[in-house]
Amino acid sequence: VLQGIGGSLLYVIDQYGETGSLYDAWDEIEGWEEAERKNSVGLEILDHLTHNVRRGEMRTWSGFYNSVFNFEEQKYFDIKGKATGLFSQAMIAPDRAIRIPLNESQDENSQIEEFIRRYNGEGIQHIALTTENIFETVEAMRARGVEFQDTIETYFELIDKRLPGHGEDVERMRKNRILIDGSDEEGLLLQIFTQDTFGPIFFEIIQRKGNEGFGNGNFQALFDSIELDQIRRGVIKVDA
């Protein structure tokens, strides 16, 4: 067991030759398949775990993941809003099976700093889960009462101009507030974020159609959305 960000525990699991891992020896619970069919909304596997860390610690933790687990930097972001900003360094495992983005505030009032105050330290900001059909998944989750972050209407008005020939149903995206990013070369990515679910922690639902990024074009939109909520709540103030 290793100590990770914010005192979290990272468990290293043995592989037992051809027999696999210790999880392969677990007994199945009777009726699990029926329960899964009844309760599933189409979520599949963990895509990434985004962490918020204190100012000056992003490079420390990216170095930790690099030296201990051989993770490499996949992407670096410098995001600025109306009054605040953040740096983000996305790390990826050698087999590309898991990604660990690390966020660090550029100032004392950003959403990263607010998270650290509410969470009482560094920790996971959001958990991203994959789906093969984001429309059906989000509609099923909404029907069960899950609330998602909103996006300004002009975002959807500009999709066809920003990504010509994307082939997605913009009206259904608008109805569900689903974001899109990508290119002809890299493929597409569809994503949406829930409201805070456990304290300041929220979830991301993501469908990858060849794109291995993080919705680079949407990162700014997400930051702006959360910053706008901070302004509305009086956490930060901007000149009129």
Language-model features and meaning:
Residues 1-73, 82-240:
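Glyoxalase I/VOC metalloenzyme domain signal
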